[in-house]
Amino acid sequence: MHLLHPHLPTRRAFLKRSGQLAMTGTALPLVLNLAAIGEAAAFDATDYKALVCVFLYGGNDYANTVVTYDNPSYNLYSTIRNGGAGQAAGGIALARADLAATVLNPATAPVDVLGQSRQYALHPSMGGLAGLFNAGHAAVQLNVGPLVVPMTRAQYSSTNRTLNPLPPQLFSHNDQQSIWQSSSPEGSTVGWGGNIADLALSGNSNAALTCISVTGNAVYLSGDTALQYQVSTGGAIKITSATAPVYGSSAVSTALNSLIQQTRTQKLENEYNKVTQRAISAESSVTAALALPQPATVFPAESLGQQLKMVARLIKGQATLGVKRQVFFVSLGGFDLHDNLIAKHPALLAQVSAAMTAFYNATVELGVANKVTAFTASDFGRTLASNGDGSDHGWGSHHLVVGGAVKGNAFYGTPPPVSVASTTAPADQWHVGQGRLLPSTSVDQYAATLAKWFGVADGELPGILPNITHFGGAGYPVNLGFMA
């Protein structure tokens, strides 16, 4: 659990409840705390870098996203998922022949815990990301999930939770979304993206625009000092009382603007005025940045494509925004596919692939490919076993990291054996039932690797990722190695 500054919870609670200007009914687009007078940063950046979290809400099915392709492993996968004869599609298994165009060809083939060489392909709808992987601009981190400490199947089955603590509320959507984003279950107020941003605030002349969400509120972007500014795919959310007549009267608008400039003796009123002033200032800065010519790269028209297009436009305008470090959050829902997996999953993955590919191409166009890293996250993985028409809540999952600074065309981590059995055989020790992967890489390690690339010093990591001190060494390295 994060230890919060004693003065922040009350202020943060007030700011989060301040969604409307009471007199005007005008929504504030951000939860801006006193970012401008925040704690000293751990680093003062001289270049530009951005992290972009692509969150897949609902729990993505890992087995049909990064699909085992070598013949022995594929045959096990197909049998477990009720595939057809001769490696044909069936049940919730994909046909092996349909994976030929999206086979991943790393420089070095990954070897699983049993010493067997493995091969993977992406889902057939993910041709764009497969191309980026094979060109060296994307990597796969295998079997990531929340862990408090390194965990074996025997330790998972133990009743001694003092020695073998588990993440709370495993398999629960809301809690696992929160744990992925903040290391704490539902109700957490501080996320690791926001805590990374805390350390960069003083290097940004406009600190309020360090953390930006294009998909609504997310705890991932809330720091101890930094909080998120929210935009839509259409741009800045306007404070209409500052830019248009209120109740048809310019005089009322002028009066309201005058009121928020006044210093108040009542602390709550004073803080409210400061928040509103920053919201108006941030809106003005974002509008100016978005007035620049848009990137020529064509983005998909679907939701995720348009969210990432907005991120690309904001990155293009980073000098206008006055920022050198930024953390973004975008998302796509619909991945909780207990049924209709074969029918619905392809379109979702197609969105992810097309949007992330277009986004990478835009960073190349803007000359910032080496300075921007996008990565996937999700509530949890899912069962390898079929429930008849879909898969159920799981734990570990495979994730993609994309960008010019990514050491791509490679797999990181250890491939788990393809298994749903519950014997004492070595192949059966890497899941916790029904093929729910027991993570061999923690979210803390995944986040730490991204944070270090962003500029966070080793000594700052425990303040951002509370469990990172439980990991280290060859088996659970703090730096997973996928960033240059």
Please report, for each region that a protein language model flagged, where it lies by residue:
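Feature for exported/extracytoplasmic and membrane-associated proteins, marking the mature portion
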Residues: 2-365, 385, 407-484
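Active-site lining segments that contact anionic ligands and/or coordinate catalytic metals
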Residues: 325-327, 369, 377, 394-397
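Generic beta-strand/beta-sheet core signal
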Residues: 331-333, 375-377, 402
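Short glycine/threonine-rich loop-to-helix capping motif typified by GTGT followed
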Residues: 339-344, 380-396
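Metal-dependent active-site segment of extracytoplasmic phospho-/sulfohydrolases and closely related
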Residues: 363-388
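Hydrophobic, well-ordered secondary-structure elements that form the walls
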Residues: 379, 399, 450
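Catalytic or ion-translocation cores adjacent to nucleophile or general acid/base/metal-coordination motifs
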Residues: 393-411
